[in-house]
Swiss-Prot record:
The lineage of its organism: Eukaryota, Metazoa, Chordata, Craniata, Vertebrata. It comes from Danio rerio (Zebrafish). It is found in: Nucleus, Nucleoplasm; Cytoplasm. Residues 20-63 are annotated as: Required for ubiquitin ligase activity. One of its GO terms (molecular function) is DNA-binding transcription repressor activity, RNA polymerase II-specific. This is Transcription factor E4F1. The gene is e4f1. May function as a transcriptional repressor. May also function as a ubiquitin ligase. Functions in cell survival and proliferation through control of the cell cycle. Pfam families: zf-C2H2, zf-C2H2_6. Residues 59-125 are annotated as: Disordered. Pathway: Protein modification; protein ubiquitination. One of its GO terms (biological process) is regulation of immune system process.
Amino acid sequence: MTEENNNTAATVTDQTEHSNIITIQTTLGDEDEDIHKCGKCLAEFSALDAFIQHKLSRSCKRTQDPQTNVVPNEGVSVEVRSSENECSSDETATANGEKQDAKVASGDKKRSRSTSEDESSSPSKVVWKLNTEGRYVCDICAKTFKTTNILRTHMFTHSDQKNFVCEMCETAFRTKGSLIRHKRRHTDERPYRCNQCGLAFRESGALTRHLKSLTPCTEKIRYSQCKEILVSKDGIRKEVQPSSPEPEKEQIPVVRVVEAGQEIIQIEVVEEVQQVASQPQTATVVEADNLICQAIINSGIALETEATEAAGQVEAQSPKAVLGAPETETRITEIQVTEECVETLAEETQDSSVKEVEPVQSKLYKCPHCERMFKTLNYLRVHVKGHVGYKPFKCLTCQKEFLTGYVLKKHMETHVSERRYKCGECGKQFKAIGHVREHMRAHSDERPYHCSFCDKSYKTKNALQVHHRTHADDKPYVCQHCSRGFREKSALVRHIRHHTGEKPFKCSKCGRGFAEHGTLNRHLRAKGGCFAQLKDCEHVVNSEEQEVTTESVSTTIVSDDPHAVLVEFSSVVADTQEYIIGAPAEEAAQGEEVAIIQDNQQQMDSHIMKVVQQIVSQSHGGHQIIVRNVTADETPGISDSGDTITIATPESLTEQVAMTLANAISDGTILTTTTEDTDETSHTTVTMVTAENVETIEQEEQYVIASPEEVEIQTVVVV
């Protein structure tokens, strides 16, 4: 069907009655000239001018005419089928013994039977399908493409062959386009730039997602970074011409080409990006045979470097020419950190300051500092920079520094006041989607993070890290006002509010302010409700003429009645004087603020609950609330500690008061009541179980409930 004539390919069209099949068969030959083929009409041109004129003309259309001559790749027989006549074409192709179909799928070639005796001598054949729109259809995934070249490239994605290998990290890819996109990660080339904010991206898809994001790109943070990239010595064969600098800076840009002893050329590039880019940056183009070197120079990075005083020494040591280097000595203001590209790990470097990277097993790279393993050398380089404190990306809002631009981008979400992400379980809103995923673990019963020192387990990794500090007694967060240390930064923030008096959380019912959001929630969930106008009690004798100053140390309520109540208020508790049970005027003049509650049990219980709720809501972090009962023949001891609130209740109310306090701190309930017998008396300790992050600690046969707000409750029933 196909005849070979010297070094040219002849095409014969085989038409059947049932289908239109174009079968093109070519043989190998010596190609003396370059052939330019049109992707639409598949026409070939030997002259470049004729090919360009053909592309500019509008007469070029994709044809489905079976008479059109198509010249495929060398040694490949191509059969183009129409999707409408696919069934009839298959029958014709099977009947013809000289045709041989090849179908590419996952790297395997399925060949039909051939009547030819010498199967190896006949060229292979690839079947392309055309749909009604004139697009080529993939047999495996049914995707359509404009040209056969694009379809042929697409077929490599269904194969296991990875013939395109990165020269820097030896990662293999199926297509050349994937390799080019991968190399941009090494060179940091970002050719796709947003016209609104000036932010650049490595891939066009990333730019498209950026333009379609929920938040419009009105203001984007630009980063100031300093980089040094090392490439092989053979990669640079031309002199490097830097871009012209800005005239107002009075600096001469220099790209220093340094010849090292390890056959490595060092290129120092300093990138300085302004807040608002008024003019587009001019990229410096360098003719270089090496693709990596050309990508580095043509990546759009502004080569705005300052000359160093060592430029003269570099010029003397290296035979390479340095263009634009000044003769005068200047100083560099940026700290240069060298990033080395180690191609052969077995070779030992002469510099003793650089530690040797040890490859482990199947291309795993181990960090010499912390024994962590990485799949690629590039990840290891970024990780090692964190050990040496190299953090070139700086937040302009809080001045924090980060190792990579991606981490800085995630950090910038914390400065956004809008909370766009909402938890579907509890309705809590967050600024970042990652915070929602971390929060969702609180609604599950899984505790995957176990402590290696004890048997405790936690739902989040951060909670486990905070718990580890309890074993090491590590409190890295120190208050600048009182030098008190905390294990969590959030605890320090809440503590500082007590110094500053800040109460950002307001109650919508009574208008009271709270320093913490959790305290406001507990205030709203209190059993007695929100008492905004509670000034006195209906069933308590209260003197309206009595004035109590903020310097009063305590107020004591004593009675011989076994149901009497003793309440000791600390002087550091704010606004508690209005809830002190008043005494007669003549007793107050003697300095003894004592009142006796002589009423029925129900009225006294109601009053105690109100007082307890007010005490807990107005007490701040660092207080210790002790609940104990008082008998008729017992004289209660009054603590002189300024951080203690003692509430002595009758035996019948101790358990109820303890439960109220537990609810005030966190949704706690009384679980068990255990009795511990001693020589003379028996003590009953009320054990409470509270919500998460509130620990129950046993201290001297008593239970202390410790909450994140640094408030401790000690409940003891004395029988």
